[in-house]
């Protein structure tokens, strides 16, 4: 399947189930090659954050997309499946293309779709967890005082790709001691010391499905209040 790297993407779906992929200018061929839909459109609203000009591009429009899936009316109801992930640029482009449309939050539809997984989806998640588990085990075997947090992440990255992941499921991080106060964090050049508490969060992506494992590791003996907190 297709998922964008540094551009954005969207899927327009009509009430009768016809669908089209919408991608940014640099994902036209990539998107068409990797997605199962037979309709792919290039819209500047989905361009990357550096905001390139693309002077020779003749982009598609939301009208082109909607027409291709059988929608020609202008006074329509448009459901946005994730307001949280829809940029201002994309939202404004929809409003400008369909000024008479009623735009509503359709996030509940995605929640319902995600609530029940097909056997294929479960297979992707199981494979992702299998790979993430191997990465976790390999990092635990290799971790030692003197190694940096980033070196530990490097081990995990090597292992997930060696074992079949198409990408990291989420940005992987390994952080230690004071940084373990963070709910999420970025790995640093800090070197592990004896007695450190180290938090692993390692992941693998299979066909767009992300599986992540979080696990604490102690480089030594865990005692007192530290033991109470971790356990």
Cite the ranges covered by each PLM segment.
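Active-site neighborhoods and metal-handling regions in enzymes and metal-associated proteins
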Residues: 1-231
């Amino acid at each position: 399947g297709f998922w964008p790297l540094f551009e954005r993407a969207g899927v327009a779906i009509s009430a009768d189930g016809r669908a089209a992929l919408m991608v940014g200018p640099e994902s036209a061929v990539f998107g068409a090659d990797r997605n199962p839909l037979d309709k792919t459109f290039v819209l500047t609203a989905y361009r990357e954050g550096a905001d390139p000009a693309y002077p020779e591009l003749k982009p598609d429009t939301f009208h082109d997309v909607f027409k291709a899936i059988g929608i020609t009316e202008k006074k329509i109801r448009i459901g946005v499946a994730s307001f949280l992930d829809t940029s201002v640029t994309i939202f404004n482009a929809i409003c400008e293309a369909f000024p008479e449309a009623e735009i509503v939050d359709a996030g509940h539809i995605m929640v319902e779709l995600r609530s029940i997984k097909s056997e294929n989806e479960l297979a992707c998640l199981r494979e992702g967890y299998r790979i993430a588990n191997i990465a976790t085990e390999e990092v635990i075997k290799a971790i030692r005082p003197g190694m940096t947090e980033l070196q530990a992440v490097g081990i995990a990255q090597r292992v997930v790709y060696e074992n079949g992941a198409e990408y990291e499921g989420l940005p992987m991080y390994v952080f230690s001691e004071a940084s373990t106060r963070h709910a999420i964090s970025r790995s640093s050049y800090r070197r592990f010391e004896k007695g450190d508490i180290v938090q692993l969060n390692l992941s693998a992506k299979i066909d767009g499905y992300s599986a992540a494992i979080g696990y604490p590791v102690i480089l030594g003996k865990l005692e007192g209040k530290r033991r109470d907190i971790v356990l």
